[in-house]
From Swiss-Prot:
Principal cellular location given in the protein's record: virion
Name of the gene this protein is made from: N
Organism ancestry: Viruses, Riboviria, Orthornavirae, Pisuviricota, Pisoniviricetes
Listed name of the protein: Nucleoprotein
Annotated ranges, domain CoV N CTD: 260-383
Organism per entry: Puffinosis coronavirus
Segments for region (Dimerization): 267-384
Amino acid sequence: MSFVPGQENAGSRSSSGNRAGNGILKKTTWADQTERGSNNQNRGRRNQPKQTATTQPNSGSVVPHYSWFSGITQFQKGKEFKFAEGQGVPIANGIPATEQKGYWFRHNRRSFKSPDGQQKQLLPRWYFYYLGTGPYAGAEYGDDVEGVCWVANKQADTRTSADIAERDPSSHEAIPTRFAPGTFLPQGYYVEGSGRSAPASRSGSRSQSRGPNNRARSSSNQRQPASIVKPDMAEEIAALVLAKLGKDAGQPKQVTKQSAKEVRQKILNKPRQKRTPNKQCPVQQCFGKRGPNQNFGGPEMLKLGTSDPQFPILAELAPTAGAFFFGSKLELVKKNSVGVDEPTKDVYELQYSGAVRFDSTLPGFETIMKVLRENLNAYQNQDGGADVVSPKPQRKRGQRQVAQKKNDEVDNVSVAKPKSAVQRNVNRELTPEDRSLLAQILDDGVVPDGLEDDSNV
């Protein structure tokens, strides 16, 4: 018995597939799937033999194995495809964490001719296969294989193969790729949809090459897709994004003090329940200092607000508007107006209480628990109790004058001079030679009072 992605319970390994006349299971390729939707358009033409993994040379344009998930396409050159440790395995119903292990396989796509006649190479697309399946079913986890990126859940044992059934395209469609909350997609890549864009593109291009009459007939006999994806759609998307931004995306937008002030004021002008804290308007400027009634947020999250990299995983726990109103206890309370200029203004509070329940089966459970522990009642572990936004140090009133007065007193003491040269030696013990010398200097020949030798006292 093997697990089947997308099903709640484990199922047996699929073995239906496409069978040849001798009853042998024939491996089906992406090329076969692509040709199915266009065979009904080959009117008056001799059917071409289908190319499979056994009949077509390995030219890099055919994926020889079916992945359970849609691919991840590169749209920026020079970007490395990798995931953080413990991330990168697509999630699907029915697959336990112990079986979430495998690898991403790089599929080098074919080139195409642009409208101006130039030959362009499509950037590669990556497909996920569980460990022990796919083109490198015999490889061990972590082997150095070109075009392979190994990923695994932290709870998975990578020493054994995953007990996952092979995907039969006639029975199971590709599952849209999605990851556990907190997963960071490699920069320069985007997740494909259901995997049906290639046949739509091929059938659309064929109908355009037949002329207006045949194209009209084809459109009447076949339902047109909602949107036709061209081979160079990734490049066009990138160009449109850059044009929308009006500058190179590689140059970060500079935030000046004036722009940050405008953003902060714009946020603070909104009602309290509509504010979204960020770097320009931190949490405590939006909602006040931390304390028993507002007890969430560590130093880093208070500083960054929703811009904190850990915040998206917390947003998975946030209730929807429907859950807020219909799943909470609500109470309408009238409050006294605090406005002096508007004493008759009616102020109400919609007080609410509720709970968000989750268990260890929630994707990203360990990360969520870690973030919650770091931020719940974090103000109690900080110096001075509740963490407040540290204002610029203010000089106490009169502090400058007091300091200046002390400096003046020190200066006065340092520059004060004795009234006479004799007084400088008052505290010095006089020797007989000193007394004799002083007697000669003075007119009367008598040593003044106060200059007597301390030894005679």
